[in-house]
Amino acid sequence: MNGYGSPYLYMGGPVSQPPRAPLQRTPKCARCRNHGVLSWLKGHKRYCRFKDCTCEKCILIIERQRVMAAQVALRRQQANESLESLIPDSLRALPGPPPPGDAAATAATASQSSPASQASQPPAPPRPATELAAAAALRWVAEPQPGTLPAQIAKPDLTEDRLGDSSSADNAAESFSDKDTDQRSSPDVVKSKNCFTPESPEIVSVDEGGYAVQKNGGNPESCPDSPKYHAEQSHLLIEGPSGTVSLPFSLKANRPPLEVLKKIFPNQKPTVLELILKGCGGDLVSAVEVLLSSRSSAAGAERTAEESLVLPSSGHIFEHTLGSYPISSSKWSVGSAFRVPDTLRFSADSSNVVPNPLAVPLQHPFPQPPRYPLMLRNTLARNQSSPFLPNDVTLWNTMTLQQQYQLRSQYVSPFPSNSTSVFRSSPVLSSRTTEDPRISIPDDGCPIVAKQSIYTEDDYDERSDSSDSRILNTSS
C-alpha cells in the first residue's frame, strides 16, 4: 500500500494505516515541462523562457489552447441563446444586420480557432442586432457617461455580462469607447435602428449603444443624448409610496442635488428643499422620497388652530431655527427622523388663545399615542423679557394627560417664581394630583435670574403636589 492511498480494497488483513488523500496538484507550465524544466504556472506566463518556442510539442499545446477557447466561446453563445429564449414574443423583432461589435467578435473568434476545431464544430450563426436590444429592453438604461470605463463591445464576455448580470450591464451601458462612438455615427447603425415591428408598442426607440428603451405602464422614457428625443418623452414619472413626480430628463448628472430638487418640486421653497436635503445627508433619492411621502399627509393641514401649539404674533423664540421650515408639520414624512409632531404646528394667528409664549393643547379629536418630552433650550430666547428660566424646560405631552383633563382653553405654562408656590386649583381641573401636567425645571447648577413678578402672592395657594409643579390659573 502506497502513501497516497490504494485504489484497491485488500480483503486479506487489516489495514495498517488509514489511506491518505493525495495532495492538491499545483499547475505547472506545460512548455517548460516539454523542455525538462519544472515551473509553477502562477505568474509565470509572461516570463516563460519557451513562450515563443515552435517545436512540435509547443505547437501542439497552442492548438490545444485554441480548441479550449473555441469551446468556451460556444458555451457562452449557448448560454446567451437560452437567455434570449426567455424574452417574450412581444419584445422580439425582425432579424436585421448584425452590429459592428458582433461582426468584429465573430471575426476574432474565427481567426483564433484552428482548422481542426472548425472542422469538428459547426460555425456559429451571427446574432441579430435586435436580440441584444430586446434583452436590454427589460431594464432601464442610465445616461451614458463616456470615459468612465473603457468598455469593449467586441468582446463576447462583455456581451454575456450584459445579458446575464444586470449590475455589470449597467456599468457597460454607461461607458463607451471612442471606437464605439465612431461606429455609432456610421450609417449602418442608423439603418439597424429601424428594425422593429410596428406591433410591439412597448419598444419606443433604440439609443446609440443598440439598446431599446421600454415604455412601462404608459411612462414614456427617452435618453437625453438620443437624436430621436421628443418633447412628449422628456419626463420620467417616478412613483413614490404616496404619489408620483415627473423627473425631467434634461437634468445632468453633474448638477447639484439642490438644483435637481428645484426642478422636480418647483412649488416648494428653495430654503425648505435645502433643509430637507441637509436632513437627508445630501442624499437626493431620500429627499425625493421625503417630499413624495409628504404629499399624502397634505389633507391633515386643514386642522384648526385650537388643536396646535400656537406662537404669538410677536414670537421670536424660534425665528432663527424654525423660520425656514414649512408652517404645517404634515409636510414632513411619517418615517422621517426630523418629523415635527402633529400637535406642534406654528401659526401666526394667536387671537383666540392666551397670549403666553408657550401654549400646549390638552384636547384632541382622537386619542394620540404618548410622545417623548420636547426639550426647549433657553438659548432660543433673544431678549431678556422671556419668561424662560436659564434652565431647560421639559414639556410633557402624554396620553394620560390628554384623556384625564378634557380642557379647551387651559394651557400649561412655565412661571418664574420659587419652586414651593403653586397656583390655585382651577374649578375645571379635577382634584387628582397624581398625574398633573407639569413643567419640570431641574435646578442643576444654573443660577435663577430674579425677574419681576406679574401676579401677587394672594393669587397662589399651596397644594399637596410635587415642589416643581406649576399650573396657571387663567380662569381666576
Curated annotation (Swiss-Prot):
Residues 418-432 have a biased composition (Polar residues). Residues 255-290 form the DMA domain. Residues 176-185 have a biased composition (Basic and acidic residues). GO terms for cellular component: nucleus. Keywords: Developmental protein, Differentiation, DNA-binding, Metal-binding, Nucleus, Sexual differentiation, Transcription, Transcription regulation, Zinc. SUPFAM superfamilies: Cysteine-rich DNA binding domain, (DM domain), UBA-like. This is Doublesex and mab-3 related transcription factor 3. The lineage of its organism: Eukaryota, Metazoa, Chordata, Craniata, Vertebrata.
